[in-house]
């Protein structure tokens, strides 16, 4: 029996793998991946949609009506819409964020991509981001899927994380290290 009584990563993985296999079979993988990312962004950006998903008092009909409207507005792939309807009918829509994130991650892994996080103190141009991505691709001998964030609190420098490897050249980190040495002394 599972120690985790909640909806586990394994369960999310099963649903996402099922969606992946259906998408491959229907030859719509790229479209469904893009639409899944759109749904993830909608969950992040819309408090109303997040509430509809997370509030257990919302009934299936309300969720299905909202899904229908979202499907029309975003012109979602029919297979993805049916999959999301299935989640609603099985009372698993509460976990749609985990499931779709797992699906997008599965797509990346199947393409042989490594996920990388880049955070910089200054806004980087598209060209600078692409140059960093190319260097990471060379260094890790793998295709890189790069997520970029700007964080002025770093003061200067970059933080790059690929898998479990992290390089932090930020001034904020250097100041923190100096502070720690002074406390220890």
UniProtKB/Swiss-Prot annotation:
It comes from the Bacteria. The keyword Phosphoprotein does not apply. Its main location: membrane. It is found in: Cell inner membrane. The keyword Iron does not apply. InterPro entries: ATP_synth_OSCP/delta_N_sf (IPR026015), ATPase_OSCP/dsu (IPR000711). It is a peripheral membrane protein. Keywords: ATP synthesis, Cell inner membrane, Cell membrane, CF(1), Hydrogen ion transport, Ion transport, Membrane, Transport. GO terms for cellular component: plasma membrane; proton-transporting ATP synthase complex. GO terms for molecular function: proton-transporting ATP synthase activity, rotational mechanism. Pfam families: OSCP. F(1)F(0) ATP synthase produces ATP from ADP in the presence of a proton or sodium gradient. F-type ATPases consist of two structural domains, F(1) containing the extramembraneous catalytic core and F(0) containing the membrane proton channel, linked together by a central stalk and a peripheral stalk. During catalysis, ATP synthesis in the catalytic domain of F(1) is coupled via a rotary mechanism of the central stalk subunits to proton translocation. This protein is part of the stalk that links CF(0) to CF(1). It either transmits conformational changes from CF(0) to CF(1) or is implicated in proton conduction. Belongs to the ATPase delta chain family. HAMAP family: ATP_synth_delta_bact. F-type ATPases have 2 components, F(1) - the catalytic core - and F(0) - the membrane proton channel. F(1) has five subunits: alpha(3), beta(3), gamma(1), delta(1), epsilon(1). F(0) has three main subunits: a(1), b(2) and c(10-14). The alpha and beta chains form an alternating ring which encloses part of the gamma chain. F(1) is attached to F(0) by a central stalk formed by the gamma and epsilon chains, while a peripheral stalk is formed by the delta and b chains. PANTHER family: ATP SYNTHASE DELTA CHAIN. This is ATP synthase subunit delta.
